[in-house]
Amino acid sequence: MKSIEVHTDGSCLGNPGPGGWAALLRYNGREKELAGGEAVSTNNRMELMAAIMALETLTEPCEIVLHTDSQYVRQGITEWMPGWVRRNWKTAGGDPVKNRELWERLHAATQRHRIDWRWVKGHNGDPDNERVDVLARNQATAQRDGRATS
């Protein structure tokens, strides 16, 4: 099983507002950058999209260390998801889970991989986190300025 290192980030100019996501995948000394955006989104949706797109890009089962500065994503997938599924996609308070379609997509994308979800403090000098932050912000800016390519 291949070992892959993944770094993800999402960005939103306003919340909601133009959004961008980015991922950096590293395997065996090679790197691949992924990035995209949406004209209107939220920061949480973009954080989820970064992880989803990174995992959906992989064509075979892998051992992954996925770094995210989003506690929402890390806690959602590692702690909250089992309860949401048990309660038919309701929170502990009985409200519908926000971004359910993205959580379901992320859950599906995780099934064939072994993933170690690691939280990294954002904007704290981690070079890979800073790199995906710039890529995601550039995508959000491109969405805002009408020059998006994705």
Curated annotation (Swiss-Prot):
GO terms for molecular function: magnesium ion binding; nucleic acid binding; RNA-DNA hybrid ribonuclease activity. One of its GO terms (cellular component) is cytoplasm. The keyword Hydrolase applies. It is an enzyme of class 3 (hydrolase). It is found in: Cytoplasm. Mg(2+) 2 binds at residues 9, 133. Monomer. Belongs to the RNase H family. This is Ribonuclease H.
